[in-house]
């Protein structure tokens, strides 16, 4: 420094700190004035001075110097409290996932930034000479961000793909990291496996693809003769002077530049620093420059279109491989950028919005016409200012005026009282060049299972008109109605029907399949059971376990009913086709010692409601005739007198009738216990055939015998049956009969041994083996069954019904279900005897069928259901009549156990029109609906007060029943309530009964009002609102199981039922914490399933908020599983300050994978754009210019996007390199099928210039469309198949080239390297022999004329850019990227 000062006569002393930026400027001035050699000598002295001063200061660093900021604890607690409130809002459906993520990131980012700002004052006050504090601002090593991670908090991190991890690292490196925080930190590590592997491989592969695309681009000519250019102008304000200078330096002008009448630059002149300075000084007209886009060469480039060489300040030399230079220039920063700047370990850096706070307490006022309601990016309601808004805050003594800039959010309402320092507005942060936001997709996945519904209209995306992709036009909720879908493979069938209820341990899809306690909402559409029941049950087949069927199951959760009947030898597939459903009746006759089964009495009525003669109306399975162990059943039967005529021995659709083979009188029969094991063929059996074993003997590896006896092994198909016969073995001299039953004391009279027996015995003759003639006798004990009367079904019905009258007769019949003399039961439970109630009527009547339907009787708010059976003739010939005009059909007010209406005292008839009786609070009115216009002839009611028993809720142990409300409200007649949480629905899946609701509002009672509906609903169904507001039954939603835990029952007390407004309607969706009445319970989120007098049932649902433009995956009512994609948001997010995000972005642009959302009315915009182009320019040139502009603007947009990524990382890449790449991926066109050409085949990819030249040569229009090829696809569509084969898919490319007979002219570098030839660049480059100056005069004159025409076209295309830009800006949203460089 002394030498410098001695040689400078005028010494200047600057007393200020020189940081890194000032040092760069100083060194640059040294180089300009003294040269490189003298500057390096000066810098060596500066280095020596620095080392000397650092040694004298002797600064050291220890762990004690890392002082944690005291305010960190309460700052982190405040951020956690805000995050908890945010999570609650997301759970309620007030904010969606993107808003939650965005707000969570900003909460923690603001906390981290505040800690970083507190770091300097804390050090200054506590320890100003702290080594950490001094080093953090020296610029030599480390920066403030790294010190902040040491003593503040690490904050938010980015993953390898650049996506934000919303779990912040609250600890700093001084305190130490937890295991989770350490794993998250590993993503941003410098030399970690994640960092090195992902970045290096991605950058290397990107470079390889780029070089593949442009390896053949070589400078081969001086001038291609183009007259086209790209206009660049700094006037529009979208381009800074620095970018303007970088764009122009090294280029060649495409036209002369004039200032007034003076020409300051000529065509084909290269642009240097001096010329650019004159452009900026004089603010010249838009400058037209030559670029690789405008070069007319097909497979190379000319000197003037490329410009100056990057290595020296002169035009690029001929033979320069500019393509490979371009590819490496773009790919190289990806591998090197991580070593350039200080590495902060993937820590997220972003920006927060500025807040405007109230200066004092007061009332706020503003002009409401200048704002419109919207949502902030955090999901809060706000007003958006369209222009400057003046807000007045009136306090007691002073009035404050605050100006809110445009595009800001106002967070308060007009005339609202605000407190001092309260945030009243939010100003959007201005986007800078180095901190640009990007659009990303965020997929939201379902975290529960159920049906999807929405409560707004949706649009189909244009490309998914017939798919399940929908676009949301406005903010609304998507609902997942909770349920448990069945996952079944093809083949197994469900035995459940719609609205059935299931037992906790029940048979649902496969035999012995355990299902959750739930209520099904399933339409049977699949195979009914399994292959066991595909046909008739032959002797010896295994019968699955049916012990749980056909009964009311009393579990811990609720009293439920099992849905189907399974007979051992019935064809269940035929049953499913008959669409049979069952109504269970549970009856308790108080005071009588009747045998009432747990299963109750089941009624079986076909879905179409038509009953034939001798149909089984009700049946009862006696539990004493159910065998739950394996064995043989021996019957002794005799035929009953048939109650069916021979001509009626046909099976009517949907009805079970008596066949003579079923009509066996129940005589005593016997059960012979036998132990049976069904084994697979591969099982290793540890006992031998015909061996005798004891009890508890090991049979297979995991099975032991329960009893001892003789072992027989039988093979059948792919299974083995191992049978153990218990009993005694005898070897008599002669055996007369093979099988025989011996009663107690039976046998030979002289036999003393058999006289001592007190039990039945079963004797059967057996062979030791198939080939021996010797027999032995096996004597087994027998369990006898005696005939019992069983339950008297007649006691359940009024005595009039059991008397044979002129109309209907009911007859009790006991019969056995199986007619085989010997029935084998293997490992199962089976019903042997059934008691049935048979419906019949007079044989003389020419009536072939009866119609069954249901009647609802409402008495004092208590609903009862009765069965009505009508004898009906053909509906066409019937004429109605009424015998008893006084029969009003009213039930007496005392509500006795027996219905006081004599079923046969009157015959009701109705007209064909539907009866529209309103829900009247009068007592005892019978509401009914005719069965699809079928006429009625007679009425029969099978009833007792306990037929449809509704148990008290006190017996129910389902956790979702609010028991506290039961205790608080003892006045509620819970016993009379109906619903899914009681003993089950009284009616299951019966389509004939409907609930009539009129157009007016209906008072069910005087303390609850239902909203008015205009639909007719089926009773006790799930009513859902579709997107048009119509209420319907979701028959399309099959195989969904409603768990009782998903149904919440809310009781309304009498005191506030009167205050309930009709806001709760059927099918309505309610968010959590909504109160439907004063002092009422706070509801959980869900859909109103049933509205009753004193309660509502709400099905649990999970709301998901979605904003306009979101993409919904799936159809309305579709069943979703956990983890399915529900909705996709497209939102803007800040880019982290690391190249990790840059590389995927560059690759995304160059591979042409767009993530920009498509406008929902894009087609209308394009139509309008075409019309405006036609109107401005006239019809002849409109579409030509439109196609030209499309290609030019797409190329410029791609260049700008790539440059934006690299400039945000501080990397300077010249536009020419990117332009060469973009030129190659946009230079192909796709030949279309319109007006098919004789030259190219449809679908063929050809070069754009080649297509234009071929069209001019043939004087024929070639129809094509421009396509954007990604760099991978462009590498596979070149003129050299050797280059393509060396890139990827070698065998396929070579085989295809051989079949097509392609010729490789070896013009590129790579194909010559592969074949060992001289590469056509550098010294191997040969100058073209034909130069433009050797052209004859006549051809030159024609070229000159042609150039004049092209100049006129250029005037139209490029000198009227303002016209096109205004048109484009009105039709495309991304005007910045489409404007200029």
Swiss-Prot record:
Protein keywords: Chloroplast, DNA-directed RNA polymerase, Metal-binding, Nucleotidyltransferase, Plastid, Transcription, Transferase, Zinc
Lineage: Eukaryota, Viridiplantae, Streptophyta, Embryophyta, Tracheophyta
Enzyme class: transferase
Ranges that cross the membrane: none
Cofactor binding notes: Binds 1 Zn(2+) ion per subunit.
Protein family: Belongs to the RNA polymerase beta' chain family. RpoC2 subfamily.
Catalytic activity, EC: 2.7.7.6
Residues binding Zn(2+), per UniProt: 224, 295, 302, 305
Pfam families given in the database record: RNA_pol_Rpb1_4, RNA_pol_Rpb1_5
GO MF annotations, alphabetized: DNA binding; DNA-directed RNA polymerase activity; zinc ion binding
GO cellular component labels: chloroplast; DNA-directed RNA polymerase complex; mitochondrion
Domain of life the protein comes from: Eukaryota
One of the protein's GO biological processes: DNA-templated transcription
Keyword Lyase attached: no
Role summary: DNA-dependent RNA polymerase catalyzes the transcription of DNA into RNA using the four ribonucleoside triphosphates as substrates.
Main location (coarse class): plastid
Subunit structure: In plastids the minimal PEP RNA polymerase catalytic core is composed of four subunits: alpha, beta, beta', and beta''. When a (nuclear-encoded) sigma factor is associated with the core the holoenzyme is formed, which can initiate transcription.
Protein name in the entry: DNA-directed RNA polymerase subunit beta''
Catalytic activity line of the entry: RNA(n) + a ribonucleoside 5'-triphosphate = RNA(n+1) + diphosphate
Cofactor(s) this protein requires: Zn(2+)
Subcellular location(s) per record: Plastid, Chloroplast
InterPro entries: DNA-dir_RpoC2_beta_pp, RNA_pol_beta''_euk, RNA_pol_Rpb1_3_sf, RNA_pol_Rpb1_4, RNA_pol_Rpb1_5, Rpb1_funnel_sf
């Amino acid at each position: 420094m002394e030498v410098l000062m001695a040689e400078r006569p005028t010494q200047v002393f600057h007393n200020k700190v020189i940081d890194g930026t000032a040092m760069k400027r100083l060194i640059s001035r040294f180089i300009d004035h003294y040269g490189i050699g003298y500057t390096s000598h000066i810098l060596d002295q500066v280095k020596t001075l620095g080392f000397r001063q650092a040694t004298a200061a002797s600064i050291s660093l220890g762990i004690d110097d890392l002082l944690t900021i005291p305010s960190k604890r309460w700052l982190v607690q405040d951020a956690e409290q805000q995050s908890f409130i945010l999570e609650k809002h997301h759970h309620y459906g007030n904010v969606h996932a993107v808003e939650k993520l965005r707000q969570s990131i900003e909460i923690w980012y603001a906390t981290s930034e505040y800690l970083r700002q507190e770091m300097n004052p804390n050090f200054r006050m506590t320890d100003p000479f702290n080594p950490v504090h001094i080093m953090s601002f020296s610029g030599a090593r480390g920066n403030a961000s790294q010190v902040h991670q040491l003593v503040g908090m690490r904050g938010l991190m980015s993953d390898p793909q650049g996506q934000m991890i919303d779990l912040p690292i609250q600890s700093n490196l001084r305190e130490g990291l937890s295991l989770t925080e350490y794993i998250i930190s590993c993503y941003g590590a410098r030399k970690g496996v994640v960092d090195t592997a992902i970045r290096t491989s991605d950058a290397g592969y990107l470079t390889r693809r780029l070089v593949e695309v442009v390896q053949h681009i070589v400078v081969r000519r001086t001038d291609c003769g183009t007259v086209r250019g790209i206009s660049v102008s700094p006037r529009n304000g979208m381009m800074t002077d620095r970018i303007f200078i970088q764009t122009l330096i090294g280029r060649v002008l495409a036209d002369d530049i004039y200032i007034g009448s003076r020409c300051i630059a000529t065509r084909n002149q290269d642009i240097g620093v001096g010329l650019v300075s004159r452009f900026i000084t004089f603010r010249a007209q838009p400058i037209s420059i030559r670029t690789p886009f405008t070069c007319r060469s097909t497979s190379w480039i000319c000197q003037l279109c490329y410009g100056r060489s990057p290595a020296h300040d002169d035009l690029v030399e001929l033979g320069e491989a500019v393509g490979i230079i371009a590819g490496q220039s773009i790919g190289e920063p990806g591998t090197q950028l991580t070593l350039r700047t200080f590495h902060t370990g993937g820590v997220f850096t972003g920006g927060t919005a500025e807040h405007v706070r109230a200066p004092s307490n007061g009332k706020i006022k503003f002009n409401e016409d200048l704002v419109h309601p919207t949502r902030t990016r955090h999901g809060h309601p706000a007003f958006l200012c369209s222009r400057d808004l003046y807000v007045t805050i009136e306090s007691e003594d002073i009035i404050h005026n605050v100006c809110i800039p445009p595009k800001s959010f106002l967070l308060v309402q007009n005339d609202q009282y605000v407190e001092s320092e309260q945030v009243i507005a939010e100003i959007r942060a201005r986007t800078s060049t180095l901190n640009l936001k990007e659009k990303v997709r965020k997929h939201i996945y379902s975290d529960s299972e159920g049906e999807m519904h929405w409560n707004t209209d949706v649009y189909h995306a244009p490309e998914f008109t017939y798919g399940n992709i929908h676009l949301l036009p406005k903010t609304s909720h998507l609902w997942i109605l909770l349920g448990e879908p069945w996952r079944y493979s093809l083949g197994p069938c469900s035995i459940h029907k719609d609205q059935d209820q299931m037992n906790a341990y029940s048979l649902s899809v496969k035999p012995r399949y355990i299902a959750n306690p739930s209520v099904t909402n399933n339409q049977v559409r699949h195979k009914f059971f399994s292959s066991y029941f595909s046909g008739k049950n032959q002797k010896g087949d295994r019968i699955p376990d049916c012990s749980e069927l056909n009964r009311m199951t009393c579990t811990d959760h609720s009293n439920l009913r099992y849905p189907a009947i399974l007979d051992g030898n019935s064809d269940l597939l035929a049953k499913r086709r008959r669409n049979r459903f069952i109504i269970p009746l549970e009856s308790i006759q108080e005071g009588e010692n009747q045998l009432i089964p747990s299963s109750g009495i089941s009624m079986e009525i076909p879905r179409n409601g038509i009953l034939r003669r001798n149909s089984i109306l009700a049946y009862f399975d006696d539990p004493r005739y159910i065998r739950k162990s394996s064995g043989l059943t021996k019957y002794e039967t005799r035929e009953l007198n048939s109650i069916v005529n021979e001509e009626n021995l046909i099976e009517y659709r949907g009805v079970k009738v008596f066949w003579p083979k079923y009509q066996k009188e129940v005589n005593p029969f016997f059960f012979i216990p036998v132990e049976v094991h069904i084994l697979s063929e591969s099982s290793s059996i540890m006992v031998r055939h015909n061996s005798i074993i004891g009890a508890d003997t090991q049979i297979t590896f995991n099975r032991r015998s329960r009893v001892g006896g003789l072992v027989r092994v039988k093979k059948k198909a792919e299974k083995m049956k191992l049978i153990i016969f218990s009993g005694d073995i005898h070897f008599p001299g002669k055996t007369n009969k093979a099988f025989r039953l011996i009663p107690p004391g039976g046998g030979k009279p002289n036999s003393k041994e058999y006289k001592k027996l007190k039990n039945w015995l079963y004797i059967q003759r057996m062979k030791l083996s198939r080939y021996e003639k010797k027999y032995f006798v096996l004597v087994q004990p027998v369990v006898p069954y005696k005939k019992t009367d069983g339950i008297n079904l007649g006691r359940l019905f009024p005595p009039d019904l059991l008397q044979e009258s002129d109309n209907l007769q009911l007859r009790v019949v006991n019969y056995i279900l199986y007619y085989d003399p010997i029935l084998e039961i293997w490992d199962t439970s089976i019903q042997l005897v059934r008691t049935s109630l048979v419906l019949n009527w007079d044989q003389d009547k020419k009536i072939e069928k009866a119609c069954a339907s249901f009647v609802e009787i409402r008495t004092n708010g208590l609903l009862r259901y009765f069965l009505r059976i009508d004898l009906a003739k053909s509906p066409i010939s019937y004429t109605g009549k009424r015998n008893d005009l006084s029969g009003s059909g009213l039930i007496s007010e005392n509500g006795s156990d027996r219905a006081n209406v004599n079923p046969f005292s009157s015959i009701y008839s109705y007209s064909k029109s539907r009866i529209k009786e309103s829900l009247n609070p009068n007592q005892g009115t019978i509401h009914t609906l005719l069965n699809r216009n079928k006429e009625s002839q007679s009425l029969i009611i099978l009833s007792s007060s306990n037929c449809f028993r509704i148990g008290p809720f006190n017996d129910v142990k389902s956790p979702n029943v609010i028991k506290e409300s039961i205790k608080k409200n003892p006045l509620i007649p819970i016993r009379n309530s109906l619903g899914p949480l009681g003993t089950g629905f009284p009616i299951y899946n019966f389509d004939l009964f409907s609930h009539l609701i009129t157009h007016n509002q209906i008072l069910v009672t005087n303390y609850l009002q239902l909203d008015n509906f205009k639909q007719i609903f089926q009773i006790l169904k799930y009513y859902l609102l579709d997107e048009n507001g119509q209420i319907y039954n979701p028959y399309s939603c099959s195989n969904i199981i409603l768990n009782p835990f998903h149904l919440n029952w809310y009781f309304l007390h009498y005191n506030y039922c009167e205050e309930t407004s009709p806001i709760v309607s059927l099918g309505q969706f309610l968010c959590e914490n909504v109160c439907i009445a004063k002092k009422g319970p706070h509801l959980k989120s869900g859909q109103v399933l049933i509205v009753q007098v004193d309660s509502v049932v709400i099905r649990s649902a999970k709301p998901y908020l979605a904003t306009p433009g979101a993409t919904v995956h799936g159809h309305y009512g579709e069943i979703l599983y956990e983890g399915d994609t529900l909705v996709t948001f497209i939102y803007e997010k800040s880019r982290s300050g690391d190249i990790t995000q840059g590389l995927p972005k560059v690759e995304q642009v160059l591979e042409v994978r767009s993530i920009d959302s498509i406008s929902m009315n894009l087609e209308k915009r394009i139509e309008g754009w075409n019309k405006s182009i036609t109107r401005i320019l006239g019809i002849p040139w409109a579409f030509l210019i439109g196609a030209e502009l499309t290609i030019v603007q797409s190329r410029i947009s791609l260049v700008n996007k790539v440059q934006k990524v690299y400039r945000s990382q501080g990397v300077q890449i010249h536009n020419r390199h990117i332009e060469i790449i973009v030129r190659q991926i946009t230079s192909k066109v796709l030949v279309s099928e319109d007006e098919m050409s004789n030259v190219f085949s449809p679908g063929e990819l050809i070069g754009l210039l080649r297509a234009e030249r071929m069209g001019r040569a043939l004087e024929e229009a070639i129809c094509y469309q421009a396509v954007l090829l990604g760099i991978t696809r462009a590498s596979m569509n070149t003129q050299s198949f050797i280059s393509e084969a060396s890139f990827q898919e070698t065998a396929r490319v070579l085989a295809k080239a051989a079949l097509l007979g392609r010729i490789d002219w070896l013009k590129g570098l790579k194909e010559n390297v592969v074949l060992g030839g001289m590469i056509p660049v550098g010294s191997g480059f040969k100058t073209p022999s034909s130069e433009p100056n050797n052209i004859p005069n006549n051809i030159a004159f024609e070229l000159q004329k042609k150039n004049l025409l092209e100049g006129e076209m250029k005037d139209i295309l490029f000198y009227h850019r303002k016209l096109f830009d205004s048109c484009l800006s009105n039709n495309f949203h991304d005007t910045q990227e489409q404007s200029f460089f």
